[in-house]
Amino acid sequence: ETTLLGCKIGAMNRLPASFFVSVAYNCWAFRRLGVILDPKTGEIKRWLYKDERPIEKEVKQIIDEAKRDGAREVVLTPPISEEQIRQLRVGDVVVINGPMYTGRDALHKYLMDHDAPVDLNGQVIYHCGPVMLKDDHGKWHVKAAGPTTSIREEPYQADIIKKFGIRAIIGKGGMGAKTLQALKEHGAVYLNAIGGAAQYYAQCVKDVTGVHFLEEFGVPEAMWELQVENFAAIVTMDAHGNSLHEDVEKSSLERLAQFKDPVFS
């Protein structure tokens, strides 16, 4: 009754010298789960961490922390106007209610040379390859919808924003200088979703209203039309040329330079 997709029995750092400077990115932050097994039967005797810190509380905590730092919470319903986007600043919490479209590598490459199957003007593109399940009545349901790494779309994103009038890109990890310039020129923002919160974001999807390129690209790469409620993400690249990712990289390099002298003689 239980499908085991991955199992970590134990772990030991293989490169001790790197242990103290390792950085664990937040992709796995909300995926901690464990079980106590019966050694004779393999039966699950007890779940670990399952109800320890519900994801809803984690997300609320992240949003509350952002607000304490002076950020605003802004609710947007696509289609979104350029005026609404220009009012946003890095650090603001954006809550999306309404339509959203998924798009990964295959779709971005396709859109460079083709028209979109829907009108994307004022809309939101979500860098996501959702886990989907079709019920007995042929209706699709989202079972997991976490963000994927956005930098893979850097070769395409600026052109697609300009071509289709997209107002918001959602993903994780940020994007590069070309995309940042396009956000500024055309009035769009990049929203960083919470890595590893696939179950939480799946709960935000209230309906699947359509799908495009399913046969051509497959489930993860298809363009899914979603209706979402209370989909929260943080502005990390705004329409004024500001990038939190760029700022963090700069400050990190400055701090790293303080330790440039050899540690071991």
Task: Please provide the spans of the model-predicted regions.
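Short, structured beta-strand/loop micro-motifs enriched in basic residues and often containing a Trp
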Residues: 70-80
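Intrinsic disorder at enzyme termini
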Residues: 47-70
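C-terminal extensions of enzymes
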Residues: 24, 75, 101-102
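C-terminal binding/interaction regions
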Residues: 1-33, 39-43, 54-57, 203-265
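Generic structural signal for buried aliphatic residues
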Residues: 94-96, 100
